[in-house]
């Protein structure tokens, strides 16, 4: 299985930021020009981008549209986008705007039929975002924890054309404490849908650990460690290959 790296651009108030454990008031601004950041990642050799509208995740509707459109104009790389996408109309609008894949998180738990219907109609374009704390699904921008296991939610989307699952351990996100390999591997073994690891990646050894897990893990999101310089792009790309 190909292992793809997705540098993350998290958008808050039009800027590229990183959060600690999903807390909006714990945001560090890394670039006030997200399009510039997208160009930089492309120049480093990354072939895909992972973009999150953080304001949108909390508002339940797209907020940073201008910043997203700037990213799309700045790079030829396929962009997957999440954050506040809760309706079929929003899905269609983003795909028409040039987004490669939309990530559906909260709505995957609240209205799984909407997600399944969209995935069947738009094969390869729908990604399910499963954010978990201690193995349980969290929703509404991580403000709430549900009583559903992450593996249970993942299995609900088998066979309907979902392109991938982005699995985030929110207890580790932004902390650089190391990716949760057992959690990601358990999910990857539980379903045939490609699973992408997210949350806590601290260095190139985490990429190697995901690849060496024996689970069919399809890739990893790279966040704070890439911005802080703890991950060198060329080394990460080599490890992923």
From Swiss-Prot:
E.C. no: 5.3.1.16
Catalytic center residues: 10, 131
Subcellular location: Cytoplasm
Reaction(s) catalysed (UniProt annotation): 1-(5-phospho-beta-D-ribosyl)-5-[(5-phospho-beta-D-ribosylamino)methylideneamino]imidazole-4-carboxamide = 5-[(5-phospho-1-deoxy-D-ribulos-1-ylimino)methylamino]-1-(5-phospho-beta-D-ribosyl)imidazole-4-carboxamide
Keyword Isomerase: yes
InterPro entries named among the record's database cross-references: Aldolase_TIM, His_biosynth, HisA_bact_arch, Isoase_HisA-like, Isoase_HisA-like_bact, RibuloseP-bd_barrel
CC terms in the record's Gene Ontology section: cytoplasm
GO molecular function annotation: 1-(5-phosphoribosyl)-5-[(5-phosphoribosylamino)methylideneamino]imidazole-4-carboxamide isomerase activity
GO biological process per UniProt: L-histidine biosynthetic process; L-tryptophan biosynthetic process
Domain of life: Bacteria
Alphabetic keyword roster: Amino-acid biosynthesis, Cytoplasm, Histidine biosynthesis, Isomerase
Biological pathway: Amino-acid biosynthesis; L-histidine biosynthesis; L-histidine from 5-phospho-alpha-D-ribose 1-diphosphate: step 4/9
Pfam families noted in UniProt: His_biosynth
Family listed: Belongs to the HisA/HisF family.
Protein's recorded name: 1-(5-phosphoribosyl)-5-[(5-phosphoribosylamino)methylideneamino] imidazole-4-carboxamide isomerase
Source species: Hyphomonas neptunium (strain ATCC 15444)
């Amino acid at each position: 299985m190909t292992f793809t790296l997705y540098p993350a651009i998290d958008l808050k108030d039009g800027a590229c930021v990183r959060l600690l454990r999903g807390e909006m008031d714990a945001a560090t601004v890394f670039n006030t020009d997200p399009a510039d950041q997208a160009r930089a990642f492309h120049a480093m050799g990354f072939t895909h981008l992972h973009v999150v509208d953080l304001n949108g995740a909390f508002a339940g509707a797209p907020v940073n549209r201008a910043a997203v459109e700037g990213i799309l104009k700045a790079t030829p790389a396929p962009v997957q986008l999440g954050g506040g996408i809760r309706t079929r109309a929003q899905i269609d609008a983003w795909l028409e705007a040039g987004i490669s894949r939309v990530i559906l998180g909260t709505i995957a738990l609240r209205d799984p039929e909407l997600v399944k219907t969209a995935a069947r109609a738009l094969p390869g374009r729908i990604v399910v975002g499963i954010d978990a704390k201690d193995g349980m699904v969290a929703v509404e921008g991580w403000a709430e924890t549900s009583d559903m296991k992450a593996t249970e939610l993942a299995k609900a989307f088998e066979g309907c054309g979902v392109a991938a699952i982005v699995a985030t351990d929110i207890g580790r996100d932004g902390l650089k404490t190391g990716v949760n390999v057992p959690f990601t591997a358990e999910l990857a073994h539980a379903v045939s849908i490609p699973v992408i690891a997210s949350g806590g990646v601290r260095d190139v050894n985490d990429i190697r650990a995901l690849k060496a897990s024996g689970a069919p893990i399809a890739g990893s999101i790279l966040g704070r460690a890439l911005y802080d310089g703890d991950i060198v792009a060329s080394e990460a790309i080599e490890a992923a290959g």
